[in-house]
Amino acid sequence: TQKVPLWLRLTATDIPGHGSAPRVTSSVKRILRAGTRIADTQFERRAVPEVQAYFAALAPFQDGERQVMMSNISRAVDNDAFMFTLQMEEPWRAALLSNTCSLTTLKGSNKINVVPPTAELELDCRLLPDQDPQQFLSELITIINDDSIDITRIMGFTPAISKTDTPLYDAIEI
């Protein structure tokens, strides 16, 4: 099972100006606020069936509490302490359990004393394979909560769940 890439560009527009006369609002302030809201969001955690099977297969090789949690990952996603530890120690595994967005590119003025008319933030979002991208975009719009920010889809794929009941997968398991 592979998460589905959805790359987005957020663009904020506001009145430009000079750095010596700060405005109440600016494109940079708007884009930073949007980025903070996204970065602070914990998207719903859940395990699709293939990911449940993956964690269950790893569980016997874990110790103590971690073994218990991984053997029933669908329940463990509600345990904040376990999920925090997993995120800190194995972020690639934690990422399998929710939609994610990494803030990757930030653009504003090319001069230190110029407040730009536009500022951009690019996101590398990865969606669970059964997630509807349009529904996710709607959720993101709600999180951003700023109608003046434009969202452009740079790239996105259709959902894809890899089958695990194939001869190749059987050979890998052996």
Language-model features, listed with the residues they occupy:
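Hydrophobic core residues within well-ordered beta-strands of beta-rich domains
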Residues: 6, 119-121
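Short glycine/threonine-rich loop-to-helix capping motif typified by GTGT followed
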Residues: 60-61, 116, 161-169
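Acidic-enriched catalytic cores of C-N bond-cleaving enzymes acting on peptides and small amides
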Residues: 1-8, 19-105, 114, 129-149
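A short, flexible beta-alpha/helix-coil linker loop
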Residues: 15-18, 156-158
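A short beta-alpha structural unit
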Residues: 55, 151-165
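Phosphate/diphosphate-binding loops
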Residues: 172-173
